């Protein structure tokens, strides 16, 4: 078995500096692969998250909001595929580079991840008819 970890969510301006330490701890625990996902704020989560920030991190609220807007084109979230999980632009590139460097230093993602359906067993259950 090849353990992996997914650092999720990366909250820009709040938890992004923790990436190298998290990857080191994951590597020390045996992780061989890692990934990350930026904070996603679809639908009503924006207001909930902003209220949480105001209550628990009022001094960093504006920094987080500015970083989110830099990732998602002046919005707090963009649901576009490939953009929603990483963002785009210089700050997204900076986080991606920090992640790659931390992976290289810890030996994570050193080998390619090979996925296989070799051990999948089809349950051979026939789809039930909705209108029976």
Q: Where in this protein do the model-derived segments appear?
A:
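Radical SAM/AdoMet-radical enzyme domain recognition
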Residues: 1-6
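Auxiliary Fe-S-binding modules of radical SAM enzymes
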Residues: 17-132
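Active-site beta-loop-alpha junctions enriched in small/polar residues
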Residues: 8-12, 39-41
């Amino acid at each position: 078995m090849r353990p992996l970890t997914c650092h999720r969510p990366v909250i820009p301006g709040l938890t992004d500096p923790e990436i190298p330490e998290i990857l080191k701890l994951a590597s020390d625990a045996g992780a061989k692969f890692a990934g990350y996902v930026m904070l996603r704020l679809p639908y009503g989560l924006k207001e909930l998250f902003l209220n949480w920030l105001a209550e628990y991190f009022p001094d960093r609220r504006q920094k987080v909001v500015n970083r989110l807007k830099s990732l998602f084109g002046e919005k707090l979230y963009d649901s576009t595929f490939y953009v929603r999980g990483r963002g785009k632009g210089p700050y997204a590139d900076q986080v991606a580079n920090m992640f790659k460097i931390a992976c290289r230093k810890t030996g994570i993602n050193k080998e390619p991840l090979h996925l296989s359906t070799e051990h999948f067993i089809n349950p051979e259950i026939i789809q039930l008819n909705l209108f029976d």
